[in-house]
Amino acid sequence: MRPLIIAHRGASHLAPENTLTAFRLAKTLGADGFECDVQITRDRHLVVAHDYLTDLKTGVHGNIPDMDFDDLRQLDFGKWKSPEFAGEKIPTLEEVLEVAQDFRMIHIELKPYLDRDEEIVDRVIDAVLDAGLEEKAVLTSFEYGALR
């Protein structure tokens, strides 16, 4: 038996990290699973993005936990990587979990923010259970308090 191959933020060397395109490409390239980062928006949507700040990936200043989902969805999360990815949108956790159905494993890193630690843990667990991925999912966080 060989070790599992996990694509960090999807096939992020070829596509914009933490996007549906990157996750689908990881499958095409033969990955067994992928790692993604989950944050919660001001209006309590679960979105997949590593950085809190949108500046680097979109060219628009913003802090994901302080933004509403509809505003985030208007931003382009792809063109920073290459013009061919222009128009790539920030995915919701639910969209990413749908893609994860085709993989053996999904590694979800929780990005806690201020008073939302407990909420993000509970909401991510519920989403994983709703998607039927409890046997494939691993949850991690750099914030120990979020995992208690």
Label each region the model flagged.
Residues 1-148:
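Phosphate-group recognition and catalysis centered on beta-loop-alpha active-site segments
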